[in-house]
Structures are given as C-alpha cells and as structure tokens.
Amino acid sequence: MATATASRLAVPAPRTSPQAPGRRRPAAPLPSAPPRPRALSAAPRGRVVCPAAPASSPASTTDAGQDRLQKVPVSNIRNFSIIAHIDHGKSTLADKLLELTGTVQKREMKQQFLDNMDLERERGITIKLQAARMRYIMNDEPYCLNLIDTPGHVDFSYEVSRSLAACEGALLVVDASQGVEAQTLANVYLALENDLEIIPVLNKIDLPGAEPDRVAQEIEEIIGMDCSNAIRCSAKEGIGITEILDAIVTKIPPPQNTAISPLRALIFDSYYDPYRGVIVYFRVVDGSIKKGDKICFMASGKEYVADEIGVLSPNQMQVSELYAGEVGYLSASIRSVADARVGDTITHSSKRAECALPGYSQATPMVFCGLFPIDADQFEELREALEKLQLNDAALKAVTRFSMQFEPESSSAMGFGFRCGFLGLLHMEIVQERLEREYNLNLIITAPSVVYHVNLADGETVECSNPSLLPEPGKRRSIEEPYVKIDMLTPKEYIGPIMELGQERRGEFKEMNFITENRASVVYELPLAEMVGDFFDQLKSRSKGYASMEYSLIGYRESNLVKLDIQINGDPVEALSTIVHRDKAYSVGRALTQKLKELIPRQMFRVPIQACIGAKVIASEALSAIRKDVLSKCYGGDISRKKKLLKKQAEGKKRMKAIGRVDVPQEAFMAVLKLEKEVL
C-alpha cells in the first residue's frame, strides 16, 4: 500500500547546479511505473464472498450486489429478527451485520443505516421495522440471511410481533452493563409465542461497567434460558460479529420447503409511494411468485398484476422470482390503501390457496385524542395524509370506529378534525410529527384520553373516548375505566420512590420480587388514564433513569369518575373538557383555570373562568376588565355629570358581557392542552 501511496505523490526534482549557457542537458530516461497493487480488505477469516476477486484470492467483505440475488436452496435460508429493550444496541448490531456481510459498502455506511426516517435518527430509536437481505459464506456454502430489524419501545411492540411472525429465529440482545430490562422480558414472551429459536447476545462488553457474567446469570434466573454459550460482543467495536453470523446459520432452522404448493405470502409491512402506489413487503410461506403473475389479496378479493418484485438488500433490488421462505417486496400499481392490508395473504388468481394465513391479531389502541388543523382549509389535506399514513402504520388501522373511518369531529373552538387512537404517548407524538413534517400540516392535538365503558340507566353499555360525548349524569348509572398491569424493574435503592409513584396514581400494589440481589420487580395495577400522562417521565426521574417498565391491559373496573368542564364567560369550551377521578377534580380544575387566566388577553368586561362538574363550580378565576377613564374630560362641574358617565359605562359593560364573545388564542389552547397532559 505504501508503494501505491508513493506513486501518487509529486516527487520534487533533485537540486542541481545551474546549466551553462548554450549547452543542453540530455533528457533523463523516465522511470518505469511500478505495478499497481491490488487492494485487499481485511475480511474476517474469508467468510464473505467477493464476486470481483479471483478464485485464488481470499474472500472479501466487498459485495458487488448481484451475489445477494443468486438463488440458494431453501435449507440455506435463515429468517431472523433482532429484539431488545430500547437503547441496547440493536440498530448498531444491524449496521455491523450489514457491513461485515458486504451488504453495505463501508464508504456508504452510516449509523442507524436501516432507520430511514429523520425522526428515528433524531431520537435515536427505531420506529418502523425494516428488512435486509444478506449473503454469508460458511464452510464454502452460501447462505441467504433475511434480517428484519424491529423497534424496542413498548409503544411499538405491535411492530415487533409482526416481524417475529415472518421469522424462524431471533437474536435477543441485552446490554452487558444494564442487564435485563422490562421490554426484554416482553420481547422474549413474544418470541416464545411464535415458537422461535432464541440466540442470547450480550452486547456492549467494551464498556467499563460491563458485567457479562452477571447479566448472563440474570437471563438464566429471570427468563430461564441457558446462557452458558451466550455470544459476547461489542457491536460498536465489531467484536464477536462473526460468531453471531455463525450462530444464525447453525442454530436457527430454515423455513419449510413448500415451493410446489399454491402461493401464500404474508404481508408484514407496506408503505405508499406517490409514483408507484402501494409497495408491499411480504414473506413467501408457500409456493412462488414471478414478475407478471396475476395475484389476489385474499382479504379484500382485489386482483392485480405484479409489475415488479424484488428483495430488500437493504435497498430495493429487482428479481424475476421469489420462492417459499424468501422475503421481498411487490409493486402492482395499487392505488387504494384498503386493498393491501398488513396481515393479508397474497395468492395467485388462477390457482388460489384454500385458506389464508392466520395473519396478525389487531393492535388495541390505548390512547385517543383529537387532531385538528390550525388552518381550516387543511382539513381535506389532513384526511388524505391520514389515509396514506395509516397504510404503513398498522396500529392506526386498528381504529375502525373512530378517525380511521374518517368520521369528522367538530369543535366550536377548533373547527373540524379527526379523533385518532394510538398505542401510547410516544406513538401519538411520532404520528403528529410525521403528519407535520411529511405532509406540511400545522396541527393542534387535544389532551389524550382513554376509552371508557359507560353503563346507562336502561342497561345498555356504550364506549366513550371523547369527554364531550359523555352521557349526562341522569342517563348513566356508572363509568368503568381500563386498568393495566405494570411491571417496573428498578435497582433496590429506588424501590421507595417507585412505590410512592404507584400510590399517587391510584395504583394497587400486587407484588414485589427481587430478581437479583440488587434489582427488584415491582408490580402494580393502576388506571390506564393515570399512565398516559407523565408517568414514564416520573418513573425515570425518581429512579435517576435506571428503572424501566412494561404494561399490559387487564380489563375494566368501575371508578368514581366525573366530567370536568371549563367555562369561559359562561360558555363551555368542549376542547378543554376532560374526564377525571373525583378526588383529583379540584386540583386539575384549579391548575387549568389559573393557566387560562395567564394566557387569555383581557377584555373590556370582566371574564369569569370556571371549572365545573355539572352545574357545580369547583374552581374559579376572573380576568379583570380593561378600564377606560370616562371622567378624563370632566375637569370640574357637578358630581351628577360624573355619575351619569359612570352609569352609562357600567350599562355598556353589562350589555357587552351579555353579548360579547371571548376568543381563546391558539397559543392558550396549546399551552393548556400541554398542561392537561401533565396534571391528568
């Protein structure tokens, strides 16, 4: 390499004495150029194919791309996911696998390569699952490895479940310095439900605080998995990556060879392309599919022609055919988002499969809120944006009775909008930011609420997620709210503050177990409404960031709930109404009225701001009127003249108060809605 470097450098001419006039120095013969050396890359033990290298040279990590498209036997296909708690190095490990197998050139490599959205890079989290096809050589045998990267946050566990349904194995990545976290357990249970082969991986062993032996013991004690042969690696430093690839090949079983059966392919993801229509990601379970085949989506019954099929490596690369066990994408000029749903089965129109694949259980939305455009003219744009966004956000599709049917929600304060359901607060924030960034919308989002069961006096039970639609007290018998079981893992020194938090949120203590000498699992059952606010932030704050949580819905229970209305100048503001527990109604009402008093501009008349439960006012503030000095023109004279002017002013203010309307500015709405999220 030094020779090649030297040959490119400018060599200064040797210093000589001045030439005598009239004499010409004979030209020196040009030196012959040294032979150009062949660039060699440091491939780990020659395991990855380099199609450009001669047969006698060792294999290289460089991949020209076409090798990944070559067919391999079904017995040499491995479909796997990477599952982990958030921030345990899952995306970094995926990057190293792509780099080592030559799927992505080193000069093109960047952090979180599979995370395509700006939001994912800014927040350092994975939101959408991504797929990538890799080629790996072991014992001179080529293998096709299909990686499906998954999110780690609890709000996106539905994305994880869809990924696992398309795989036969999973890498369970655990941070060697932090140990087993709450979402680690949840992901393991998902993998076991799908009957996957799980390979434990201890990541970040290069950190000074890493304790791989302790963490391996934790996994054995908590999960019950043998970790004697757990792979110890550092995705950042590239340590142990080859051992992981070997384990994928040797431990994860291949898919079943059902290529001669009728086509059945499971759709596990999709997105909308403005030029090509709906792009479908699928896993071929039975049979095969070719470019130009006439296909049918079994749930919708719609038929299309497969204009383009290919693999994700990780960019889209066209192929002519995909067989059973392979993962790829499909484009068929699909313009209707309803025709290609996640979980649907693709089959041939001429030779249809007898039954569809099981698909996925629908995600249950946990949090509801209203989305309103600040500019009323953007209402139709918001409708179109939600239609496109719901295609590749499977959780949004589960909301069939609310906004995803696009039934408009109207508010006297904020105009027309939609009511949407989300899996959690982070999911809600991500959807809002995607709508604003990708579709250039300016939105107001109302305070989050949950779905309540209202038992009416006539014996009927109705669901209500919008406080403004809650039946009147005389028509309802009781209200039931959803409860969740929450499992918090925390170091033992923070058990006290964690239990205080559970008690403050109307939680019921269930059990506490020491999973290791220094870490405990604290289990509470509490209302979902108490958790959708700042519960997670408080959990991190009280544990100095060391605690984690995982929750699941356990059912509905009757509670003493009331509807809290906010009235401004006697008029209720529907957008600020909320459902709260009676014990918290006063504190919430007081906080909202004080905040509104700070934000609403003063008027020419006195404006009362009241928090009410039915007809009863429980908290009140008032904006004093702007006073005009009507006596300024009276320099003297009879007192009756002054009294007449003051009386006339008082009558005018009384009339203005009776017919006047107070406009709440958008800034006040946004500030109060943010406050509601904090105090509820």
Curated annotation (Swiss-Prot):
Alphabetized UniProt keyword annotations: Chloroplast, GTP-binding, Hydrolase, Nucleotide-binding, Plastid, Protein biosynthesis, Transit peptide
Binding-site residues for GTP, renumbered to this chain: 84-91, 149-153, 203-206
Gene Ontology cellular component terms for the protein in this record: chloroplast
Top-level taxon of the source organism: Eukaryota
Any GO molecular function: ribosome binding
Stretches with biased composition (Low complexity): 38-60
Presequence boundaries: 1-51
Region described as Disordered: spans on this chain: 1-68
Residues in tr-type G domain copies: 75-256
Compartments, as annotated in UniProt: Plastid, Chloroplast
Presence of keyword Transit peptide: yes
Primary location class: plastid
BP terms from Gene Ontology: positive regulation of translation; translation
Broadest EC class assigned to this enzyme: hydrolase
Role: Promotes chloroplast protein synthesis. May act as a fidelity factor of the translation reaction, by catalyzing a one-codon backward translocation of tRNAs on improperly translocated ribosomes.
PANTHER family associated with the record: TRANSLATION FACTOR GUF1 HOMOLOG, CHLOROPLASTIC, TRANSLATION FACTOR GUF1-RELATED
Name by which UniProt lists this protein: Translation factor GUF1 homolog, chloroplastic
